[in-house]
Amino acid sequence: NPNTLFHVDAVQGYGKAKILPKRMKIDMLSVSGHKIHGPKGIGVLYVRKGVPLFNLIEGGAQERGRRAGTENVPGIVGFGVAADLSMKNMEANQKKETELRDYLIGQIEANFPNSKLNGSRSNRLPNNVNFSFPFIEGESLLIMLDMKGICASSGSACTSGSLDPSHVLLAIGLRHEMAHGSLRLTLSHENTKEEMDTVVRELKVIVDRLQAMSPLY
């Protein structure tokens, strides 16, 4: 259908990889400020010229009449600064994050021989690590990591309220028990190798404990 619109959710990728909307023939693209160390509650919607877009909120002429209401000026300015810094430092940040990512992947594989790295080892965002651990629940894993001060996820923010295993992991062939025990760690160029060691150390204690409790392990 030639009238189909192509929308890209670039929240995770913006600032981590080059995104060229015109060259990629993207119609609409979403970006969020907090993913690039900007303020929370601010984002950007890129809309290709000529794409019809209906008003979200009627009233004033703010945002070219698309969404009435006073703009979040501090958030907009903060996002602009964060975006500028992200673009200027992208290459250096990619290098640092890739080194941390590969180090963390290596440490997890060394300490958890029955774990599985989800996705390609190299063809992935420089700051993304996603593993599955058999016969444990992702929710329990996240709660226990949180108690140790480690922020993690078992899937996308879109499915954060669901206890079901990731439909994406199931679609790429993971067994139910592996998809249910998935863990996503998103890194920053501000992280350190020492923090990666802390994650692995705490993860080892938690995974061993949860697997020992599992009747299936």
Predicted regions and their residues:
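Pyridoxal 5′-phosphate
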Residues: 1-217
